[in-house]
Amino acid sequence: MKGTKMQIRIAFGSIIMMFVLALPSNADGKGELQKYFSDTANKVKSTENASEKRKILSESFQSMSEALDKVQNSGMISKVDRIGINRFKATLQEKRDELAGSNGYERVLDKDLNAFSDYVVQDMEQAAEMVTISLVALLLIIILVVLIV
């Protein structure tokens, strides 16, 4: 009887610990996405050549898009996560269109690429805050971005 009570206490304590530890992890996961775009902006600003800046931004968008697609198609995420990822992908696609000047957007001028990279960081941070993505999906995205890059 005492052994059973102890196992229940351990299980209950473990569940509580998982919830307590998951909260900061969730916030950190979104921070990792923000860091990804911030690192891209820093690379853009440290490069003088406009075509290189475009390449850095384009590759960053492509890597994130591939990671989002893989997570979305993995079957490991909920319907709510899929909806959130679709919203995030739509925002990302808008940035790609702005950079390239497609789908009704004017192409970002060479002289504005540094400012555009900052704008992307701010806009993607806001998108990450507005979109609901679970911890599991967020961690999968981060892992895949690291593996793709």
Model feature map: region roles:
Residues 2-12:
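Bacterial N-terminal signal peptides that target proteins for export
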Residues 32, 39, 59, 63, ...:
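Extracytoplasmic/secreted proteins, especially bacterial periplasmic and envelope-associated proteins
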Residues 79-134:
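Membrane-proximal, non-transmembrane alpha-helical segments
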Residues 16-24:
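Hydrophobic h-region of N-terminal signal peptides that target proteins for export
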Residues 12, 23, 128-129:
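Intrinsic disorder/low-complexity segments
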Residues 13-16, 135-148:
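Core hydrophobic alpha-helical membrane-spanning segments
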Residues 1-2, 20:
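Extended interaction regions within the primary functional domain
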Residues 8, 23-77:
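N-terminal leader/propeptide segments of preproteins
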